[in-house]
Amino acid sequence: MEVILLERIGRLGQMGDTVKVKDGYARNFLLPQGKALRANEANKKKFEGQRAQLEAQNLERKNEAQAVADKLNGESFIVVRSAGETGQLYGSVSTRDIAEIITANGFTLHRNQVELNHPIKTIGLHEVSVSLHPEVQVKVMVNIARSTEEAERQAKGEDLTSIEAIYGIEEQPLSEEVFDDEDEAEDQA
């Protein structure tokens, strides 16, 4: 199905472009969300008549998104989750979790604006991209930890998945004596 885009859509086109998309994508997403019109003569004339107004609305939304981006860019958010000793989470942190944390801190954000290739499954500092507008993207830091104290330690740069951090002992390489003792025990057996 051919549609006329009413706003910029990533990997598809700019406002005013006539593009061919799959019928389901147009019917279930683009048309109901008001992001496109069916490409017929009546809609083309309607779009050309409203083009200046649509461009002004798009510029206004972009400026609002840029104002939020200036506040949000580089911010760090703490997510507390249960995890094993090695740093593997019991579960994962998804786009919904990140959007809820950011929203709880006073920003308006939907989960589809958080760009995450796959759920986060380990503790640590993770950089996440947030798309506030098709032309405005920011990076935020998500600090996933077992507790707020641990999150503060991670923020300072401490590695909490090392043996020293887990057990409180220094990680030391095995000396050759250990291997020699094992070899002697095997020879005697």
Swiss-Prot record:
The keyword Disulfide bond does not apply. GO terms for biological process: translation. Keywords: Ribonucleoprotein, Ribosomal protein, RNA-binding, rRNA-binding. InterPro entries: Ribosomal_bL9, Ribosomal_bL9/RNase_H1_N, Ribosomal_bL9_bac/chp, Ribosomal_bL9_C, Ribosomal_bL9_C_sf, Ribosomal_bL9_N, Ribosomal_bL9_N_sf. It comes from the Bacteria. GO terms for molecular function: rRNA binding; structural constituent of ribosome. Pfam families: Ribosomal_L9_C, Ribosomal_L9_N. One of its GO terms (cellular component) is ribonucleoprotein complex. NCBIfam families: L9 (TIGR00158). Belongs to the bacterial ribosomal protein bL9 family. Binds to the 23S rRNA. This is Large ribosomal subunit protein bL9. It comes from Brucella abortus (strain 2308).
